[in-house]
């Protein structure tokens, strides 16, 4: 009997029925082998499979996923039920034929024993069949859920692997297990989670901002009219410029003290903020104040939902103060927005809506992500998430739920042993390049009451934290097949931190991001249009988006982004303090600084004018062998390539170092320049930013353009004393500038001297530093 059963199994493995072939063709998987043995007993289990799946996931899946996953099972069950009777008839005929053959070949007692064995094994096989069917269905459901949970994840291919690990899979990790737990559509507001936004809606700045209704005439007038501006001086921030295109500009003075109860903070922020911010309140700070003077003024502007540009955020001085206060504003905004949605869910559940009442529940955008935080490195993203956890948790004994926390710490944290112990760099370098400095990342964060979900799919996230490069690879470019930027359509709060570092990375990524902010999405992404705010449907989201821009310096490119892309209807506030002394005062060596002004007709012709001025006026003075050991500092990589090609064409004795130069090439170039074997050394600003090497052997210094960071000017000038051999009297420094370099010039020499140099009829100005 056992031999015949094995023979039957081998025949079933080698042959396939029409229905099995049809099943393979329809569903892409092979029909289970043992269905023929235990089909009659397995029928109830297979038919109940979709019901058990629905019942187990009905409360834990989002609506879109529930429909697609259960639809597959219902279709599978329907197909099985339709063909069930035909398959049973065929199997009964085959079993009758086999039984007749068995009666002729074997005795009755052997046949009885064989039948008993058959029944026992059939039961066990039936159990295995049920388990196989359930496991296959579960895998299919998981795959379906994974493909449908985030449309943009198929495009997030690059750079989400842990540091030092090669990318093995083409898709990034996203948390698809906690979809229902953090779904805004299926959750309701807890009784004790109400906040100030529900208690005082008329006074809450959040409610005033999102409920403000713009008119078509105002939009048209703002597009053509110049902004109205007013200036004011604050105690800490200094000189402020208030501007607005939509209304008469309103300025306000910061009060001396801040009452947390009047700031309309959502629970539990009123109680957790003081402890989270306590590290900055030591010393002369008043014990009853929860903000530093700087944080107090910054938060008042943030909480008024005006755009803000603060160009004095430095990693060494006040970077963490600023990070704490904008994280408070971001988490406060998200908690208020989600609380409004959950409260409306409860209202909709408790009452039947009548005609014309849908507008009362318009509380969302076209997509869920409402806050985008752009930071340069993974270490910054790690600190932002840690602040979110601290603000939600505080000193409460009850810990909040943070999903995927261990994975996040592994991918965004760093090992202190990886840093060379003998590496000596300036303090500002140590403050910027701390921790994990990978600049290609993006992560979604979902927040619901007292729970945080890390690695949430973008379209299920409240907050997106990413680098410009991480966003650029998912936004894509014109003509690319795999690109997505719908998740940017309803961003209500955009925070760009450490904007000056993006000038050293790739500023084009920032411009590309700003050009794709608040565009109408190409897909609905399962949105309930009856819950979408009217100004979002009208494609006016950009007039309601608040942008917070933080950097370490005043730069024309950063100013351009703030002036062009920040058009919030509430107005804009920019900090415009001018440097009085300049970084030239930090030059310690005795050195004559010759500033030569070049003329340019317009901004577009500055690049060519500088190049021709350099090769015709400056370079001939240094061609003599006496003027050896000349370092040429070039801020722009494109100018560097142009000069390098020209030097090669003219067969000049030079070497070069840029951010792409290999370590061996850097060592050779530094050695040749120190020994005088190469007369010129071309050095890019980005190399100096990322490495901060001290170049030895400099006797003559040329700044092809003023540095982006003003303190780089004094750093490079002080390199001359690295190899002082009595040639101090022959040292020279030449700087090229134009009238379009006013901001950089003021940062180097001071605003008063810069004004005189730009207005003077003379084109050459001399400064001498280090005089005794």
Swiss-Prot record:
Modified residues annotated as Phosphoserine in this record: 10, 52, 60, 64
GO terms classed as biological process: embryonic organ development; positive regulation of embryonic development; protein catabolic process; protein destabilization; protein localization to nucleolus; rRNA processing
Pfam family, one: UTP25_NTPase-like
Annotated localization: Nucleus, Nucleolus
Disruption of the gene: reported phenotype: Mutant embryos are peri-implantation lethal at E4.5-E5.5 stages. Conditional knockouts in hepatocytes do not show overall differences in liver growth but suffer from liver chronic inflammation. Hepatocytes show nuclei enlargement with nuclear vacuolization. Animals have bile duct hyperplasia and polycystic liver. Males die suddenly after hepatectomy due to overactive inflammatory response.
Role, per record: Component of the ribosomal small subunit processome for the biogenesis of ribosomes, functions in pre-ribosomal RNA (pre-rRNA) processing. Essential for embryonic development in part through the regulation of p53 pathway. Controls the expansion growth of digestive organs and liver. Also involved in the sympathetic neuronal development. Mediates, with CAPN3, the proteasome-independent degradation of p53/TP53.
Protein name, as recorded: U3 small nucleolar RNA-associated protein 25 homolog
Organismal lineage: Eukaryota, Metazoa, Chordata, Craniata, Vertebrata
Underlying gene: Utp25
